[in-house]
Regions:
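Mature catalytic domains of secreted/periplasmic carbohydrate-active enzymes
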Residues: 1-259
Length: 259
């Protein structure tokens, strides 16, 4: 904190407000770090965009990551989940020592969930399986060719084209497209993590807020068919999906043109 121009612990303020509002705090953590010289050599991203050559020192880097994770899991109260990303930067045979890292997390906070956006079959110690820009069992974006496991599922998607904020990116998905994606995720037993990149001043883009309101209006009317449901007994079809809650079955017809 002292080394930053802001001079305040942003995560502490966020954590305090989440706990106050009854929102479970989840942390995104990148295994990939272009800014550290000890990050292992051999990574495939960031070439030509300011990534330092570095010398690579895995022992040092692994200690650095675990020290950061320890700080996150001991300084900010209950943490709902650690959402990992970046494993895909290294060759598939690279040993990230994930089992030991996951054990550290579960030791510090036994109730903290662990997920990893590595685009692979889940590893031991992971509590849910995620799919990037695809629904479970689909691979339209070319990032989710792994098989669907028996773990709880999640799909992550962007509201426009980018994960972070980019002022030129106005290619926002329509409210209808977002609602359909949400419904399809529920029909495939998956949680939906919808990404929004905040503006430099911390505010959410007006278009993103408008989209959230539109989805919220739909959920106000039909939320019982999504919240607390599982995929229904009718398997997903091109025309739509089904969800169920208890002895109630909900049919979501999304495309009447399908025969």
């Amino acid at each position: 904190v002292d080394a930053t121009p802001f001079k305040r612990d942003v995560l502490k303020e966020l954590a305090d407000e989440c706990h106050k509002q009854g929102i479970k705090l989840h942390f995104y953590y990148s295994h990939l770090d272009w800014r550290r010289d000890d990050y292992p050599e051999g990574g495939g991203t960031g070439r030509g965009t300011g990534r330092p050559k570095g010398h690579g020192d895995w022992k040092s880097y692994y200690k650095f990551m675990n020290n950061q994770l320890t700080e996150l899991l001991t300084n900010y109260g209950p943490v709902g989940a650690i959402w990992f990303d970046g494993v895909w930067d290294q060759p598939k045979d690279f040993d990230w020592q994930l089992e030991e890292q996951y054990a550290l997390i579960h030791k510090l906070q036994p109730a903290c969930l662990v997920g990893n956006n590595h685009h692979r079959t889940p590893y031991a110690g992971e509590d849910f399986q995620m799919f990037e820009r695809d629904l479970p069992g689909e691979n339209k974006a070319g990032l989710s060719g792994q098989s669907v496991s028996s773990l709880p599922l999640e799909t992550c998607e962007t509201m426009n084209g980018m994960w972070g904020y980019k002022i030129e990116d106005q290619n926002y998905k329509s409210p209808k497209a977002l609602i359909h994606y949400l419904v399809k995720a529920a029909g495939k037993n998956a949680n939906l993590l919808m990404n929004i990149g905040p503006q430099p001043n911390g505010e959410l883009p007006a278009t993103a807020v408008d989209r959230l309101k539109k989805v919220g209006e739909w959920m106000d009317q039909y939320g019982e068919t999504i919240y607390g449901t599982r995929g229904g007994d009718v398997a997903p079809h091109p025309w739509g999906v089904s969800t169920r809650k208890g002895d109630r079955l909900f049919i979501h017809v999304l495309d009447l043109k399908d025969n």
